[in-house]
């Protein structure tokens, strides 16, 4: 049996509120929980997520450290092969 008066009050039907509307109920030590984001309006879960990384990671690395692009290394090899065929 838990000791009396040392545990917080438990609310089995606490309301989770997002943008002024109740989105779900859950158990909590507070009667109302106010949240900014939940799975119903988060871009990842709604399928409206935008991908910000349009360049490849290797290309960004090559540009950052002044090595050109990853494709330039392969194009140099292709040029050498063409020259050797002549």
Curated annotation (Swiss-Prot):
GO cellular component: ribonucleoprotein complex; ribosome
Pfam family, one: Ribosomal_L31
Disordered: region residues: 65-86
Transmembrane segments: none
PROSITE patterns: RIBOSOMAL_L31
Cited InterPro entries: Ribosomal_bL28/bL31-like_sf (IPR034704), Ribosomal_bL31 (IPR002150), Ribosomal_bL31_A (IPR027491), Ribosomal_bL31_sf (IPR042105)
Keywords (A to Z) from UniProt: Ribonucleoprotein, Ribosomal protein, RNA-binding, rRNA-binding
Gene Ontology BP annotations: translation
Any GO molecular function: rRNA binding
Basic and acidic residues compositional bias, start-end: 76-86
Keyword tRNA-binding: no
rRNA-binding found in the keyword field: yes
Superkingdom of the source species: Bacteria
Self-association state and partner proteins as the record states: Part of the 50S ribosomal subunit.
HAMAP family cross-referenced by the UniProt entry: Ribosomal_bL31_1
Similarity remark: Belongs to the bacterial ribosomal protein bL31 family. Type A subfamily.
Function: Binds the 23S rRNA.
PANTHER family: 50S RIBOSOMAL PROTEIN L31, CHLOROPLASTIC, LARGE RIBOSOMAL SUBUNIT PROTEIN BL31C
Name this protein carries in UniProt: Large ribosomal subunit protein bL31
Species of the source: Prochlorococcus marinus (strain AS9601)
